[in-house]
Amino acid sequence: LVFTKSAHTRAALQGIAHLIGPDTHFLSLQNGIGHANVLREMVPLERIAVGVTTWPARVMSPGEVSSMGQGGIRFMPCDGQRSAVFDLLAEDLNRAGMHCSIDPQVQEAIWEKLAFNAAFNGVCAVTRQTVDGLANPQGEALLQRVLDEVLSVAHAHGVAASAERVGAAVRDALDHHRGHQPSMLQDLLAG
């Protein structure tokens, strides 16, 4: 499982290169896009899956992550083919209560989360506001402009990301995640 920030993926893989063998498979649940390109430097595409998780988490200290609330995991092997290894991984994650599914439409979810994160992470970091600081007409208009831009790029790449689903997620965050500091704001405030 790969959870590192995008900028640290290559270094993390280089740090474990001696452990990567002919049976190694990777599931990237990193935010953003393009992670399979870096993972392909270590293993063939058929041993890579990408996905998205909606489990809320926060790094408490080095090596300690806290998760609160509920979420799920959706992923799909990059070659578009189901495999015994990834099927077993999904089963194991479900047994652990992680609500996991293998989903051929996962690119839609990845781009929708990218749009959501681009809006909240970027705007909250630049304005140094928590999520509820954007719950006003000007903040919501700015969020919408970012969402529209990211979704237009998704659509240009042939991904049918849904403005309605992202809009509902944004509304839910504005209504229920008051005081939340998106990760980019956390990083900025941590120095």
Describe each PLM feature range.
Residues 27, 51-52, 86, 171-174:
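Intrinsically disordered, low-complexity segments enriched in polar/charged residues with Gly/Pro
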